[in-house]
């Protein structure tokens, strides 16, 4: 009961002081809004500041009430040293003090372990047991291996240049042969023999012809009489010596036997007639060689006469004879180049 009386008296005192402060600020024009009430334990202090002269008492600012807490009033204690309790102003259900932000930790609840350990399991590496293989009385755990020969073996004979050979195969679309000598060739298992100029058609193509390597030879013809025509020089070689004839003369060659080299062109098929009546046809690249008879080794150059020759001789103003050859002359010139 006594405590309730003290609290009620303190509330009335604080209300009176608030009204007194408000009336003082409203009635006086010399007091500014900077008046403040400082409360302490058992005392009330009112501080006022005069307005400056320049205001002329025209300050319209409303006084600011800076104290929101109720002052504490000392109650006579009847000779006791009991301090007056602090009375809080009702806040109409609101708190004027800032709430204290307290962090509430979640309670830690231990889970039932059912007889197991709650600690994290330790990762341990378990090595596989090593099992020793039976050695059967030997020092090695594995039986000895036996070397076996390969299942498929091939034997390569050593290279022998005298017996080994290679065959060159050429695929051709045209094949040319020269007569009168027969030409034989084999293609696709068939053998063909050509004895005269003809066109041979092979239907089972593609065909491959085996072509042997040929060696060319040189044909030599022995003559007993040799005819040349002037004024063009005639040059020939026999027994390693070269002779040049520039005018009609008789040339005797003593170092017999003598041979004259004659080359043939495989493209020409014109018979070549010599002075002794021998007729030959070309045989491709194949030539023959004949040795001369020592008794027939004289080569004679016959002078040109207008009665015995079909040539016509024209006198040139430059001093040179111009020869117009006839048929016999062409044959003789052809014989020189053969």
From Swiss-Prot:
Q: Tell me how the protein is altered or processed after translation.
A: The N-terminus is blocked.
Please report the residue spans annotated as repeat (sequence): 58-65, 66-79, 80-93, 94-101, 102-115, 116-123, 124-137, 169-211, 220-262
| Comp. bias intervals (Low complexity) | 20-49, 58-74, 94-135, 143-165, 272-289
Keywords, alphabetical:
Cell wall, Glycoprotein, GPI-anchor, Lipoprotein, Membrane, Repeat, Secreted, Signal
Q: Which residues are glycosylated?
A: 22, 56, 78, 92, 114, 136, 152
Q: Where is this region: 2 X 43 AA repeats?
A: 169-262
Q: How does this protein sit in the membrane? A: Lipid-anchor; GPI-anchor
Q: Does the keyword Hydrolase apply?
A: no
Lipid attachment (GPI-anchor amidated asparagine) is at 318
Q: Where is this region: Disordered?
A: 20-165, 264-289
Q: Where does the signal sequence lie?
A: 1-18
| Annotated GO MF terms | structural constituent of cell wall
Q: Which family does it belong to?
A: Belongs to the SED1 family.
Q: Domain notes, please?
A: The number of the intragenic tandem repeats varies between different S.cerevisiae strains.
Q: What is this protein called?
A: Cell wall protein SED1
The protein's gene is named: SED1
